[in-house]
Structures are given as structure tokens and as C-alpha cells.
Amino acid sequence: MRYRLNSLPDSSLIRYAPGLVLGLFLSRVVGEWFGMPGLWAAVGLALSLGVLGAWGLARWPLGQTWPALILIAYVAYPQFDSRFAWRAVAVTLVAFLLVVSSHRRGATAGTTSSIGPGPVAMMLPALGVALAFLLVYVLTLAPGVLAADSGELQIVAAELGVAHPPGFPLYLMAAHLFMQLLPFVSPAYAVNLFSALAGALAVGVVYITAVLITGKRLPGIIAAVALGSATTFWSQATTANVRSLTALFAALILFALVWYRAAAVAGDSRAADRRLSLAALFMGFGLTHHVSLLFLVLVGLIFVFMVEPALLRSSRRWVGPIAAGALGLLPLLYLPLRAAADVRGASLALATWPGFLEHVLATGFRGDLFYFTAPADFWQRLRIMVNVMTFQFNVWLLVVMLLGLWLVFKRDRSLAVLCGGTFTIFSVVAATYRAPQTVEYMIPAYVAAVLLLAYGLAASTESMSRFGRWGSGPATLITAIVTVGAFSQIVDHQSASGAAHEGTSARDYAETLLAGAPAGSVILSHWHWATPLWYLQEIEGLRPDVDVQFVFPEGESYEATWERRARETFAAGRPVVTTWIPSVPQGGLPAPEPVGEAILFPQEARTKLPGGFVVSDLGVADTVDVVGYRLEAPDGVAAGEEVVVTVAWRPVTGLPPDVGLYVHLVGPDGVLYGQDDKPAVAGEGLALTQFRAALQPGTPPGRLSILIGVSGSATPRETLTETTVRSSSTSPYTRHRVERKLLDASDAVLIGYDWDHTMADRSRLYLHWQAADGYRTQVFDDIRAADLTLPPYRGIWGVPVRVWRFPRGEQSGHYVPLGEGIVWTGETLNGLKLSPGDSIVVDQEFRSARPINRDYVVSVRLIGLEPDGIHWAWWDLRDSIPAMGAIPTLKWVRGSFVRSSHRVTVDESALPGQTLTGALILYDAFTNRTLAILDERIMAENPWIPLCRATVRTDIR
């Protein structure tokens, strides 16, 4: 693509426009940065800089200066937004560089930006791209042991064991070799680093493939950056997992096939055969690594026969590819060879054909494949695939990907089958697959999608450039926007990295459990936490006396399995630690004690305080004596975070039935800003009860009193201890981003506002502020914006504004903050009239302000109320991982938007005129703990978010 410098009309007036826009832009930026005393001062500054800019740039041809016109996007923008201003500057600079570089190439060589597919021309930039992303991944790498499958891979790679089906033998051998080459780092870090290398190589291969397809470097760079900075790809490239290697083999297969086509089209059959054999080798290795790449192999075969239909009749030419493919399958021999080894995951069944095939083909998961095939469910899953893509890529990149898909089907059918077919088949298979890792299973589709991005950018801009002076400008503008969109992902998606997302959370959790487990105890664990526990035991040698057991479903309800396993283990005379938190007290088991986020059923009664407790002597309501407590994070908490305090107590006398304890968080203004209630379950000795109370938004900074009381008692609550409320280091999510700097002496800037209308006939306004010490939120209930008394702020061009307006969302909409930085933004179904048996889809929308590494379940109920409007006559419950399992909260990063669809049905017993309501909660899939709803108005009525106010139709026959 070539951007002509002097292709635009250069009339005497038009040539002043870029300088005028630049001057106006600078005047606005200067005014908003330093402030203006009034409107006329801003007008004077704008006129002065506008005239100066127009005069200054008019000396150059319009073909050189027109990119400054892009800045008009911010000149006309209706509010102060420094981030948008910087994006406009970035697009302008990129457009200017594109024009200048194109002019220099044209002036010196008379060539376009196309390059030949020579190996040096492609390999050196590809190596640079790969090394750049390797550096990015190393700097953002997870520092050590991880949870769930990642933890398992770190163990079995260190031991040369066998992973869960399909086994991943090639991955394990390569990761183990990587450990041997890096003896100075921990095994866990080495496996994480192997993912970084595989991810960086995949990005480099994508660059080469995109250059082969387009003949241009820039689309290749953009495709590589788009993939390397995609949310899930970045996450997988900085943690131990099999997906980075899957991406590498997908990229290598696509590269080899595109390279093969170049030779076949050129008529070089010998080169074509060699490259086809290379593709077959990559296919063999890919299938050895992960059987899901079979779908890419099938697409590749169709592509080959489209390129060379005569291959169907040339059996001799298939000898080399078949041999190469078989060679790629040789790593599968690892499984039977390790069948008898005394390592994790090994089984003698792997040395038998049935056991080998069952493991390699992962037949235990066959019930999940093509699970969502019913039309209604499949349609919902396809909608979710759109959400999956917006979860990964900037919207401008997605637009050009769609454009590339359309253009390639019009112009290049074989390439359309290869790239478009790969994207489509993996999207459809992922849409029908029942598994909570859809965002990861789509990785081969992401590789194909960025190649479509490269094709779409190259083809569309080349087509525009054919229109001469009227096309080169738009082509440059589109290229600049897409370039900035791709590189901006590096900034926007940093929270997806292993360092920011996972960090040391798995080690912290596992070390706490191992440190708190009594000698000879058993830890019953979810898979998520079992693997880091095993790693610390088997690789680092911690607490070999503790038996860590994975609790898997056994046909009964999962909760029943947990309860039975806990009782059986306790009956055998061993203390039991469980990562499962029962929903009700367990009869026949002692009162549990907290161990981190888990609980311990001890064999012996506690007689003294654990280490780290503060001694106390506090009587509460003549019912319990508090003898000590431990406050987590005593240096302070921010609004939205949990205050975690463990209280050691004993009953004064026998406890009354159904008595409970509570903790209240009270601010300096005497207002209650958080609470947690727990049943009072006492044992023979000291009882330990852990309270987790989340602070509501709007909690004022300063002293926070932690009070304890007995439920149902008229005796006042007692002060247990105090802590400090500080500003948050993380910006809250806001639907309506603004930038309003106050003109008073403070450094406060309003960065966003949100209205909530979830409660009937009620409204709430959230104002989100940033200051030097962090972020805080103010909350105003049932108030009009005009009634707020706020100091003037700096508006557009820095002009003071004294009248505050918050128009967006003032009449409708939802904004309910939850724990972990999650915000519920709808939807509700008010006013519906339904018939018995009717099914409706309730779409729930969530946003996240920060990375989340807990797995939350979205629970939606449709409830038919009794005539009293309180009790339930019937209900339909639908619990699932968000987005029908496609986008778990474990994968959410800062700024994530996730839509979760839930189909609920009106019970056949519903009566005409019956009132219907809905309920939404989120709870931890591992601990059963409900995620806090940080709206005291909602919690005062019910412990859930109300989803609808509807009725059953009265015209039922």
C-alpha cells in the first residue's frame, strides 16, 4: 500500500485547514490542562493558536499535513477526555509516519510497500517481533506455582508424569527439557517461561504467514501484535498451560500450508512437496499435542485439494507427507513408555490399546462435545461467541477482521477456506462444547482471525489507493486507526498477564492451608487448589505428613460427596481440612475452624489461641466471651474490599438455639457500611469464627470501627477493634466516563458517574473520584443532579462550569456493585405477562474493574410468589458459569464485559394473576460463599438482586 504525499488537492484555502485544526486542538489541550478564567479567554487562545497553526502548516503541501485533520475528532468531542485526546494524537502521528515513509520509498526506489517473500526479508522482522513479545511475556510472567490444570502441568512436567487426557506428551517432554536448561529457576517458573517462548514463537510465525498472504510488512506486524496482546493469548503465554503450544502448532500449520500454496501456484512441484511434508509434520505434532487440532487438519486437507486437485490422483506424492505426519505422532509413545513409572498420572492401562486410545482421544469428555445443539441453546452460544471475540480484541480490529472475511471469500476461495474455515469450525465447535474454557478452546480461531485482519487491512487499503487522491487518505486513516487499536491492546490488556492476574495467589492459598493443617491431617480439595498443594508437597517437599485428596463428583450431589468424604475421613481419626464450605452446620462433625479460606474439622478441642491472635477480654451480651481476634490486613482496607477478622470465643453458658454472631463495620459518621452474620457454633474448647464483611462504596476514609454482637440480643454491640479506610488503588468500573477536575484547592477529578434504578421508585447516583491518594466513590440516593452542591469544574477548553449534569442513565438503567470489583448492569424483565410453561431468556450483564482469580457461579431464579407476596409457591433455578460456561470469572480482566444468558421457565402450576419475581446472586464455585452485594437498600429487602416484576397472564384457558 502506498500513501501519496502530493495526491490531494492543494487549493489556497484547504491548505490552511490542517494547521487550523492543529491550533484548535492545541488550544483545547492547553486550556484543559492549565484552565481558563472564562469563555472569552478560551476563544482568544483558540483563535490565536488556530491562526498561528494555519499560517505555520500552510507552507507545506496538503499531502504532507493532512493527517493533522484527524485531530478534529477531539476538537469536536463534547467533553474533556485526555485519554481520547491521546488516542487522536497517536492516530495522527501514525498517519503522518505512514505518509512520510511511503513518500521516501517512492522517491528513492519507486516501489510500493510490498516486499518479496524472501527468507531474510521475513525472518529477521519475525525474529524481532518474537523477541519483543518474549520480553513482554517474561516481564509479565506468573512468578511461580499456579492453580488447577496449570499446577498439574508444572508437577507432571517436573516428574515426567502423565497429565489428564489427552496427556500432552510432547508438551511435557519439551517443558521438562526447558527445566533442565534452566536449573537456576524453579520448575514452576520454567514451565511458565516455556509458555512464554511458545507464545512468542507463535506471534513470530503469524507475522511470517501474514506477510506471505499480503506481501506487506505492516499488516503482518499488526496481525502479530493483535494476537500477542489478545486477552486470552496473553494470559496463556504467561502461565503454564497447553494453549500456547496449541497456538504455535496452529500457526505453523497455517504457515506451512500458505507457503505450500505459493510453491504450487508457481509451478514448483518439488518445493510444494517439501512444504506439504512440512505441513504434515506440523499436523502430526499438533495432533500429538492436542486432538482438537484435528479440525484444523481437516480444513487443511480441503485447502490442499483446492490448491492442487490433481493430488487426489497422485498417490506417490502423498508418501512424504504421510511419513512426515507419522513422524509427528511418535511422541505419543511417551504414554505407554511411562505407564509403569512411579509418577503422578501414570497407569498401567496406558500400555494397553483401549487405555491408550481412551486417554489420547479424551473419550471421557465426549459427552461435552456438540452438547449445545438444540436451536435455542445454539443460538445463545453463537451470541456468546461474539462476546468471546470482543473479550479478546479491540473493536476496530474486529471490524477489519469481518471485512477481511468478506473480501477473502470474494477474491481468494482457497485462502477463504483455510482462514475463514478455520475460524468458523473452531467457533462452531467451541459454541457447541460444554466446558468452562471456551475462551481458550478458541485460540486456533484467534490465529486465523488475525490473518483475516491482515488480509482485510491490506486488501481494503490497496483497493482504496486505486482511487488516487480520494482513496489514499482514507486508506492511511484506516491503517493508522487499526495500528493504534492493535498497539493499544498492549496497554489495555496488561491485567490479563500471569503476573497481574494470577500472581502468587495459588502459592499464598496453598501455603496457608499446609501451614495451618494439623500433623497427619487430610486436606480434601477441589481440583483448583489440589494441584498447587501437590506441587508444594512433591516438588518443594512441604508438609509430606499431610494427605491432599482431590474430591471429584461421584454420581451423587457434589455437596453430598463432600459431606460424606469429610465424615469418613474424620471417622478414621484424622483431622480434616476442606476447601468446601458447607451451607449449613454439619451434625456429627465438630465446630469447624477457619484455615485461610478453608475450614478445619479438628480431632482435638482447642484450648489456647492460635499464633498471631490479639488477646482480648470482651463479654458480649452476657452470652459469649471474646478471648482474642486476628485482623487480616490491619494497615487498612478500601471500599469494595473485605474486612476479614477471625474471633476466638467461648460461650458464657449454654448457647440458646439458633443464636448467631455478627460483625458490623461502622464509619466515623456512625453509619453501618458492612456486616457479616454467622451462626454461633461452639465446641468443647475455644471456638474460632471468621467474619468477612465487604465495605460498601461510599464508605468515607478514616477510622472504621469493627463491632461484634449477638443476634436477637437487646444488649448493645461491643467494639472489637478498629482499622482504617483508605482510598482504593484500583479505579472502579463506570459506564459513563468523564474527566472533570474541580477548580477548588483539591486535586480531585471526577472520572465517571453511574445511575442505578434497580429498586422500584428509587434512584441512586454514584460519583467516582480520583485524587493523589487513589480512588473513592460518593453515593447519593433519590436526588436530582441539579440538587447536588458541588464546586465548579474545568470543562472543555478549560472553561469553568458551575452547573453539573449527569444525563446518561438518569431515567433508567442498572449499576449494582458486587465484591471483587464486579458490577451488575442488568437486565431486568419488568412488566412481562407470561403463561405457565413459558420460557424466557434473562440476559445478565457484568463488568469487572480488576482481574479476578476466583470462579463465580451466576445463579438466576424465576419465582412464583404466594398471595402474601413474600413466600415462594414455586421457583425455577438456573446456575451456571457466566456466558453458559464460556467466559468464567477466572478469566476476567480489568474492563471485561460479559453477557450471561439464563433460560428460566414458568412452572405449570402457576396461577392466573400470580406475581412473578426474579433473583440473582453470584457464589464461589469452590467455597459456596455468596459474593457480597454492595447495596444496603437491596440487602435490606432480600439477599439477592431483584430481576423482574411480572405476572402470570389472566386470560389462560
Give residue spans per PLM region:
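Membrane-interface alpha helices of multi-pass inner-membrane proteins
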Residues: 70-80, 156-159, 223-228, 251, ...
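Aromatic- and kink-enriched transmembrane "portal" helix at the membrane-lumen/periplasm boundary
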Residues: 27-41, 72-84, 172, 184-192, ...
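Membrane-interface transmembrane helices that cradle and orient dolichyl/undecaprenyl
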Residues: 54-64, 211-217, 253-278, 285, ...
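C-terminal luminal/periplasmic domains and tails of membrane-associated envelope-modifying transferases
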Residues: 511-534, 540-957
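Transmembrane-lumen/periplasm boundary regions of multi-pass, lipid-linked membrane glycan transferases
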Residues: 243, 294, 301-411
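Signature aromatic-anchored transmembrane alpha helix within multi-pass, membrane-resident enzymes
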Residues: 18-22, 409-412, 455-492
